[in-house]
């Protein structure tokens, strides 16, 4: 089994290369960023951010969903983990990372009949959190039946929805308003490796390099 062989390789070689780092993490962690992404196997947070163990606090679920405050009881695990990262671990940044070819977002365009819901009731219940995206798409000026364009738009609207959902929580809004927590929305394109960041002022997703240039010009980034 590949996972077992990989674990052995890690123990005998890769661990040794970062032994001092792992030893320093024995009794503490101080990640700088809370990274919320999809469970998709093609999205590897530490790989796409170039970070080492101890730098990211990662939460993954189907569709990188953050239920709004009005529905928090339906996803206690997610919001409890977010609260822990912010209130106790003290992360300084929060990134919502959507991605291309997202199955959860793609399901927005499918007809969910009762038979399908009966076969996978837990998935059907979770996907309901994406209903606002479906409604927004109906009259969106950029909506297209072209599969790739439609997928990207859906994924980006979902990332924006999840950002808004996060800000419905007082403890997150308070940290953000004091500039103690910086919040970002990403759209990662699997086949090209490109990452786009949501611009809260223009309401568009821009190449991540543009975001870095803008922030470097007026703050320590």
Swiss-Prot record:
Disulfide-linked positions: none
Cofactors named for this entry: Zn(2+)
Entry-linked Gene3D superfamilies: Carbonic anhydrase (3.40.1050.10)
GO MF, any single term: carbonate dehydratase activity
Gene behind the chain: cynT
InterPro entries from the UniProt entry: Beta_CA_cladeB (IPR045066), Carbonic_anhydrase (IPR001765), Carbonic_anhydrase_CS (IPR015892), Carbonic_anhydrase_sf (IPR036874)
Enzyme Commission number: 4.2.1.1
Assigned protein family: Belongs to the beta-class carbonic anhydrase family.
Pfam families: Pro_CA
Reactions mediated catalytically: hydrogencarbonate + H(+) = CO2 + H2O
Comment on bound cofactor: Binds 1 zinc ion per subunit.
Signal sequence annotation: none
A GO biological-process term: carbon utilization
Entry keyword set: Lyase, Metal-binding, Zinc
Class of enzymatic activity (EC top level): lyase
Protein name per the record: Carbonic anhydrase
Binding site for Zn(2+): 38, 40, 99, 102
